[in-house]
Structures are given as structure tokens and as C-alpha cells.
Design a protein with these regions (language model features):
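ABC-family P-loop ATPase nucleotide-binding domain
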Residues: 1-25
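The feature captures the beta-strand-to-loop junction immediately N-terminal to the Walker
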Residues: 50-52
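Helix-to-loop junction immediately C-terminal to a conserved catalytic motif
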Residues: 65
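ABC ATPase NBD Q-loop/coupling interface
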Residues: 74-93, 133
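Conserved ABC nucleotide-binding domain
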Residues: 84-85, 144-162
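Conserved ABC ATPase "signature" region
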Residues: 128-153
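Catalytic Walker B motif of ABC-type/P-loop ATPase nucleotide-binding domains
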Residues: 182-184
Length: 184
């Protein structure tokens, strides 16, 4: 499945589920970080996963995004995309976005440039040197800056933002990619 980009309409949610996790177990040196986890998230549903340190929240997100492979169990995006058979790149391009605990932004670039870099565009050398943003792309970035509350910081370098603003910028970097499933 290298180079896969799943079109939104190919994600089959006819039975409601956008994320299907069943019987997932993950062990690290004999310690079961996840033990027979079952989780079903419906399309459009907001779900909060809470628990103490070591409860398996990060491990679960690592399994969903392909960073960690389960010892057993099934993980599907929609009904027809087996995430256990996809790599991290394929999963992110399939429409799953993930926000990490520590913000990862380009410190020496402006807020606008960070959002521009996050857009789904061709990133080869020629395109990077010669392309300019379309009106739709600029509007998308400006709308997302408004959503994340950083419109007034548009031209400010990300390294000068507060920690909380960097968190919002990273969320904005996910939003401009228009993910079908967002893990925060």
C-alpha cells in the first residue's frame, strides 16, 4: 500500500463506525499495556479517553496511527481499511490526524508558514520552489487561524508563541489537512 491516499468517499461507514478496535493486546517485555481492548467510535462522534499514567492511552493512539503494532486484535478505519497493515505515512494520508503531547511546530517559521507547510500539497523540490498558494488554500489557512485563535499572530515566528499557542498551532496544522478522524 505504499503511497496510498484514501479518498474520503472510500471510507465505508455504512454501519456508523469510523474507528473499530477489537481484541487489541499490546505487550512490552511481558507487561500488557493494552489487554483485549475494544473501542468503537461512530462517524462524527466526540470521544474522550481518560485514565491515569500507564493506563494505555498513548499506546492505544500509537496502535491507531501505526507507530506500535498490536500483538493481536483488529483495528479498522471505516469498515475496509485495516490499519494494522498500513504504515504511519499511509495512515496519516488516509485521513487520521494525531496531536502529540509536546507541540511539534517549525520554530523559525511564522504561524502562516507552519499552516502552509502542513497543507496536503506536492512537496517535491520543483513544486516547493515554483508554486504559489491558491485562493482556496489561503482561505483555508485564514479560516483555521481564526478557529485556533492565532489570526493576530499570523506573521509571528512560532518559536515566539507561548506553549499553549504552540499547542493550538499544531492543532491548526492538523485541521488544514482536513482529517476524517482527529486524535488529540
Amino acid at each position: 500500500m505504499t503511497g496510498v491516499h484514501i479518498k474520503d468517499d472510500s471510507i465505508d461507514t455504512t454501519h456508523g463506525c469510523i474507528l473499530y478496535i477489537e481484541g487489541v493486546t499490546v505487550s512490552f517485555d511481558g507487561f500488557k499495556a493494552l489487554n483485549d481492548l475494544n473501542l468503537y467510535i461512530d462517524d462524527g462522534e466526540l470521544r474522550c479517553i481518560i485514565g491515569p499514567n500507564g493506563a494505555g492511552k498513548t499506546t492505544m493512539m500509537d496502535v491507531i496511527t501505526g507507530k506500535t503494532r498490536p500483538d493481536k486484535g483488529a483495528v479498522f478505519f471505516g469498515q475496509n481499511h485495516d490499519l494494522t497493515k498500513m504504515n504511519e505515512y499511509e495512515i496519516s494520508h488516509a485521513g487520521i490526524g494525531r496531536k502529540f503531547q509536546k507541540p511539534t511546530v517549525f520554530q523559525n517559521h511564522t504561524v502562516f508558514e507552519n499552516l502552509e507547510l502542513a497543507l496536503h500539497t506536492r512537496k517535491d523540490v520543483w513544486q516547493t520552489l515554483t508554486r504559489s498558494l491558491t485562493r482556496v488554500q489561503i482561505d483555508t489557512i485564514e479560516k483555521d487561524m481564526e478557529t485556533i485563535g492565532l489570526k493576530d499572530q499570523k506573521n509571528l515566528r512560532a518559536g515566539l508563541l507561548s506553549h499553549g499557542q504552540k499547542q493550538w498551532l499544531e492543532i491548526g496544522m492538523l485541521l488544514v489537512q482536513d482529517p476524517r478522524l482527529l486524535l488529540i
